[in-house]
């Protein structure tokens, strides 16, 4: 059981007497019950190099003791930062085949900001994108390419959904 939403979050920002609407997030948000039982909290985000330490410090302020996890998949380790309350369970959730699917999904979305949260038996996947289901406008030029990209992206979402429903072997 899961949900898939295309979301556009905006907020007003004040600069002197001027108030303007700014996009905070635009993209896809998916939430699913994970097929494998788990009790830890695990977060996955694109690797930010030296900034990872600052972000990890900020995560300690939430009361969770999230520690960096070394992953067995070398390409995944290079591209993503994983933090968790349980190192062993994080590797159990993010097994190599699942990591492959995540990297395929990242490629389908052109490496745009993708994040995952595993908590309370569920996984939430957030990917920043432009409007997935909107055409380019009145002019049809480029619509075929946009349609093909959308099909690839939806295919990667379906593949990930299937991976989420796979039980441990």
Where are these regions (language model features)?
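Charged, low-complexity intrinsically disordered regions
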Residues: 1-169
């Amino acid at each position: 059981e899961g949900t898939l939403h295309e979301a556009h979050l905006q907020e007003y920002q004040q600069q002197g007497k001027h108030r303007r609407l700014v996009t905070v997030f635009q993209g896809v948000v998916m939430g699913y019950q994970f097929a494998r039982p788990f009790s830890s909290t695990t977060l996955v985000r694109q690797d930010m190099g030296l900034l990872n330490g600052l972000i990890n410090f900020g995560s300690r302020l939430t009361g969770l003791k999230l520690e960096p996890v070394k992953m067995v998949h070398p390409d995944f380790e290079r591209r993503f930062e994983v933090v968790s309350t349980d190192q062993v369970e994080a590797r159990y959730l993010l097994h190599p085949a699942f990591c492959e699917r995540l990297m395929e999904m990242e490629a389908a979305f052109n490496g745009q900001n993708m994040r995952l949260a595993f908590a309370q038996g569920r996984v939430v996947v957030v990917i920043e994108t432009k409007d997935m289901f909107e055409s380019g406008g009145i002019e049809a030029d480029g619509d075929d390419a946009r349609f093909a990209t959308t099909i690839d992206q939806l295919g990667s979402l379906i593949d990930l959904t299937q991976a989420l429903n796979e039980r441990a072997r």
